[in-house]
Amino acid sequence: MTQQIRQQPSPVTNSNLYPRLRKHFVMLLTYAILTIIAALFVIPFMWLVITSLKPLNQVFTDPPRWIPDPILWQNYVEALTSPAFPFLRLLRNTLFYAGVSTVGIVLSSALVAYGFARLEFSGRDVLFGITLATMMLPGIVTLIPTYVLFRWFGWVGTYAPLMVPHFLGGAFNIFLLRQFMLTIPWELSDAARVDGAGELIIFWRIMLPLIKPALLVVAVFHFMFAWNDFLGPLIYLDEATEYPLVLGLYAFQTRFGIQWHLLMAATLSVTFPLIVLFFVAQRYFIEGVTLSGLKG
């Protein structure tokens, strides 16, 4: 006869229960705080979408209407075909200078970062420290001298001030790419040098393919900055035919008064490409930001 031995469950004591309850409480509190913070960011965007679908007489109703009645998709057609907001021309201008400046800052920052990360020369660390120190200087401080310089060059009224400076790199982008390059094994560069490759060949054929996630981070950061830049185009561009999308929105709301439902539709149309860009590049974006901080 076989004897069955039952294993009695150990009683749950207060000493075991308290840490579990505390862990669940902390987790619940964390999610509650994160939900509130997320709502602070999501609700304005939701209001933007809702307002873009309302008729004008429902924009400022009290209490506010969260569901438009009727839903007017026609607002987008009116906004994007309005003479005050020539969307296709504004989009073309924005893509031109934002795209060119993005290519310039990615290549120049990567080249400078390669020098700081992979080359040994006298004063390298001092120069890198000076480069980082430039991030401490607010851009508004240099606004007037920069404008005077660009006017002396004859660049005011052209896209040059919005593109050419970015071909000289940027301190934050250089730092980000340098940190990523420090994670690349030195053996790859040494093997290429043994085979007779020069530094430019190593940079172009070995280093750039290996740092694609970080390059994408720099490209996305700068493209979003250039897309949303308001002050630069406002200062340096004179003709309305050269305006980007953000200045088009500004002219849209001041030329015929503020028609909020159409302005919100135009604003969402301007914002939507950046949202799509971020979600498409999200995986590489997070990878680049994470790996760039592995080694200092």
Label every model-predicted segment:
Residues M1-L21:
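Short, Lys/Arg-rich, polar N-terminal cytosolic tail immediately upstream
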Residues Q8, Y18, M27-G296:
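A structural signal for multi-pass alpha-helical bundles of membrane permease subunits
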